[in-house]
Design a protein with these regions (language model features):
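Short, glycine-/small-residue-rich phosphate/pyrophosphate-handling segment
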Residues: 132-169
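ATP/NTP phosphate-donor binding region
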Residues: 1-101, 116, 156
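Short, acidic/small-residue loops that bind anionic groups at enzyme active sites
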Residues: 104-105, 114-140, 150
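ATP/pyrophosphate-binding catalytic subdomain of soluble kinases
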Residues: 156-218
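Short, hinge-like loop/turn segments at secondary-structure boundaries
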Residues: 68-70, 121, 140-144
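Short beta-strand segments
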Residues: 5-8, 53, 104-106, 125-127, ...
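Catalytic, metal-anchored helix/loop core of enzyme active sites in primary metabolism
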Residues: 22, 26, 125, 143-145
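Short, well-ordered, mixed-charge alpha-helical segments that flank or form enzyme active sites
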Residues: 60, 110-113, 131-135, 177, ...
């Protein structure tokens, strides 16, 4: 039996693709309602403790303010940097607290950060981003219940959870990284370009999975 960690990326589903690709917005209120259902589903199906982390928009804090089981909910506080490092810190703190199962609300990038930080964690990825391949659209109550069953040991990890493929990257300077979906080598790229538009700039593609129904490059 181990605690459940829930990590929310407040900025997922809110980038420039709302303009460039007419993508839908993942509102903070929607995420808040999802977190409420996740926590209730987990606690009612065996989880004894749920760890959350404060973020700038107080999504997690507001999600649990009216939940009766306050003693079973732990809210982590740390100095925010308002970038991806906050996800790293939350994952490390939750892992240190004993969390071995994580529900991640975000996109491919958020899940990549958690997988890189805690490579032996069980991830239940819920899509709140855009053009996601790794996380899935799933009802939060069902996801919470599944996580509760895993955390409580009622559903054994070894028999019901599988390890996903990864692409491991090593750069010339010795730094390493990993991808859960794809690693793309771009030519004529510019520093700070987070949304490459031209397919002619794609030099090489390394895929962990190839699915006809999945959209875009991660």
């Amino acid at each position: 039996m181990h605690p459940l960690g829930i990590i929310v990326n407040p900025m997922s589903g809110r980038d420039v693709r709302r303009v460039a690709a007419r993508a839908s917005i993942s509102a903070h209120h929607d995420k808040q309602q999802q977190v409420t259902r996740l926590v209730l589903g987990a606690l009612q199906n065996g989880a004894q403790e749920v760890y959350l982390a404060r973020e700038p928009f107080r999504i997690s804090e507001r999600a649990v303010e009216n939940i009766a089981e306050k003693t079973q909910i732990k809210m982590l506080e740390f100095k925010l940097k308002h970038n991806a490092h906050d996800t790293v810190t939350a994952a490390k703190r939750m892992w240190a607290a004993g969390c071995r199962t994580f529900i991640v609300l975000g996109g491919d990038g958020t899940n990549r950060i958690v997988a890189r930080t805690c490579p032996d964690a069980v991830l239940l990825p819920i899509s709140t981003g855009t053009n996601n391949v790794f996380p899935q659209m799933v009802e939060a109550s069902v996801a919470g219940a599944a996580a509760g069953l895993i955390c409580s040991g009622q559903v054994p990890i070894e028999e019901n959870c599988y390890r996903c493929k990864q692409v491991h990257v090593e750069c010339d300077d010795g730094t390493t990284d990993l991808a859960l979906v794809d690693a793309i080598l771009l030519k004529n790229d510019q520093l700070g370009s987070l949304l490459p538009f031209s397919a002619s700039n794609i030099s090489q593609i390394f895929l962990a999975r190839s699915e006809a129904a999945s959209v875009g490059i991660s």
